[in-house]
Amino acid sequence: MRADVTSVPAVVLAHGYPSDVNAATVASSALPELADRIAGEMGWMAMALAFRGCGASEGSFSLQGWLDDLRAAVAHLEAEESVSGVWLVGFGTGGALSICAAAALPDVHGVAALGAPADFDDWASHPRRLLEHSREVGMIKESTFPTNFDGWARELRDIRAVADAPGLHPRPLLIVHGSDDDLVPVFDARVLVDAHGDAELRIMTGAGHRLRHDPRAVAVLLGWLDRQRNRIGSAPG
């Protein structure tokens, strides 16, 4: 996290859910480079968040836990005297949770969600499979976690970006999705746009799920962030 001027906009970058072994470390390590670019080239204060259970972060994965991590990151940035406003940028699961967090935090100025699912119903249909996968990739290390499996699983149905997107309006929402995403259907992007009511939708032709590595998607994101500077000093809706 860095900033070089006295009053700057701030952004939290939230990674997605890892898909394979060792990806829990990779997922959280992929965004610091982007954060440095946003800070160095655009003058923002940028935080690359490593959710609990990923990278060097302690704790174990749960959707509510990740949502709490996002809220804590926003609170941390808002406490900085030099910060003029906070935005959220999330990839995959991090994008969906960014929408949910911002809907409940009216001081967040806007959200960009890339490759974000509209809900987690697929996970909710097979919660034990998700739990075992989370153990396999190192996101759950404690053998006794979760102490309340039913509660852990319930979060998979209760936390839904599509339900929270209307609460983000009229604050800006950018939805970016790959036309060839094989993990999250492009239909989810359109559902989120409709739920918000005034979101900007950009479909990347031929792109898959990992938009962090697509130069076109990153260019769209940086352009959107640059336009958000004009919102500084105005109420976030």
Language-model features, listed with the residues they occupy:
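Glycine-rich nucleophile elbow surrounding the catalytic serine of serine-hydrolase chemistry
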Residues: 90-100
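Short, surface-exposed "cap/lid" segments of acyl-processing enzymes
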Residues: 5-41
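Alpha/beta-hydrolase fold nucleophile elbow
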Residues: 81-92
